């Protein structure tokens, strides 16, 4: 029973709950970035470059069995080794956008923290200073 109580204390700590919330929000945010990359940015890049779909860019590394269409999905299903560089380009762009957004968020938080420096310590009241002087003078007497 002590194990369950220890686990409950561990799980209810603030850091664990904050981490769980961060993971959930991060997963949802990752889906937004995926959509941004796949639905908005990559179509623009493919329009400029002239390719319609980056995810289907690949190099076939071996002969395909007879009758297998030469599409990435069909070749993978047939077990043909392929070098799928188009998917890598999409994932790399996705990562760069996500990293840039996280950088902007951390930068904004850092600026907010730096903008509010800690308050200077309050001056010691005069009566406390006097009491300290008396204490120090009593310590010095033989």
UniProtKB/Swiss-Prot annotation:
The chain crosses the membrane at residues 16-36, 86-106. The keyword Membrane applies. Pfam families: MscL (PF01741). PROSITE patterns: MSCL (PS01327). It is found in: Cell inner membrane. Keywords: Cell inner membrane, Cell membrane, Ion channel, Ion transport, Membrane, Transmembrane, Transmembrane helix, Transport. GO terms for cellular component: plasma membrane. GO terms for molecular function: mechanosensitive monoatomic ion channel activity. It comes from the Bacteria. The keyword Membrane applies. PANTHER family: LARGE-CONDUCTANCE MECHANOSENSITIVE CHANNEL, MECHANOSENSITIVE CHANNEL MSCL. Homopentamer. This is Large-conductance mechanosensitive channel.
């Amino acid at each position: 029973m002590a194990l369950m109580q220890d686990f409950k204390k561990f799980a209810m700590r603030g850091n664990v709950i904050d981490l769980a919330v961060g993971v959930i929000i991060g997963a949802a945010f990752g889906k937004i970035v995926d959509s941004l990359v796949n639905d908005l940015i990559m179509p623009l890049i493919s329009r400029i470059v002239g390719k319609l779909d980056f995810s289907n860019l690949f190099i076939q590394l071996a002969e395909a069995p007879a009758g297998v269409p030469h599409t990435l999905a069909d070749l993978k299903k047939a077990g043909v080794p392929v070098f799928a560089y188009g998917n890598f380009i999409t994932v790399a762009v996705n990562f760069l956008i996500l990293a840039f957004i996280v950088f902007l968020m951390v930068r904004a938080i850092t600026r907010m923290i730096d903008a509010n420096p800690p308050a200077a310590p309050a001056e010691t009241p005069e009566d406390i200073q006097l009491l300290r002087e008396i204490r120090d003078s009593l310590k010095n007497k033989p």
